[in-house]
Amino acid sequence: MERQFCNQLGIALTADGERKFYIKVTLLVFLVWLILFEAVGWYAVELPTYDITSSVDKQIPLIPQFIWPYLLCYIFPFLPLLVVKDWHRFNLTLLSVIIANLSAFILYFIFPVAFPRPELGQSLSERLLAFLYKVDFHPGANKLPSLHVTFTWIVYLACRGQRLNKLGETIVFFVAALITLSALFVKQHVVADVVAGLGWAFTSWALAGNLYRFLTGPNVDPRTGLRQMMKKLAPIMLLFGVVVFSMMRF
């Protein structure tokens, strides 16, 4: 039943050699991202914050049940591993994520955002949401742009025109839209964060599309292209990491 459903959407269940390789790459990238994200957040949380809550945000209700689609974002970024048919496109996706992160981290330092959280009840959804609030940065950090939203739409862009059929692409689009709305309904982000996250996704994707061919040689296989790309990006990423950890010490 599961295989039949996945075939109807165009999702590949088998893990060939390239897919296994890129699963390892993705897990490594996620680990590095998590370390940097936490480091940036713990530094930014000590900075003066700005409350950019708008009148529109005040009209948006808290709907705790949206915590469930919100949490989909933590597995959604792995979807391209199942649906891409051109691994150069996956390299492009990784490059988009790198561009989005480095530029977002800079803004997190310059313009840290915080806003008050609503009171919660004792339902299962509210308890889960309370846990999310508890583990988040206080009073606030890493909000504008919403990388939750950015990653979601980079995933959508990565999956377009790949193994998914029209039904599959439509489902991915609606899941991306649902995750985006959930960021507002669980009060993890304000409208400005979400709008910026959308802009970050599409801008990072466009920049990556233009940069990728300059970072890789002509007619190389995807693995070689990934190595060439990371070799050229490594000095920039290393310098950024040194700056971040140096700032945390002073």
Which residue stretches match the model-derived regions?
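N-terminal transmembrane-helix/juxtamembrane module of multi-pass inner/ER membrane proteins
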Residues: 1-76, 120-121, 125, 129-131, ...
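Membrane-interfacial, low-structure loops and terminal tails that flank and connect transmembrane helices
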Residues: 1-19, 214-233
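Membrane-interface loops
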Residues: 42-58, 84-168, 173, 215-227, ...
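Membrane-embedded alpha-helical segments of multi-pass membrane proteins
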Residues: 68-76, 146-154, 195-199
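Hydrophobic, membrane-inserted alpha-helices
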Residues: 74-80, 150-157, 174-182
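Interfacial helix-loop-helix junctions of multi-pass membrane proteins
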Residues: 122, 140-144, 177-206
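Hydrophobic transmembrane alpha-helices
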Residues: 156-160, 201-212
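Final/C-terminal transmembrane alpha-helix of multipass membrane proteins
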Residues: 177-178, 230-249
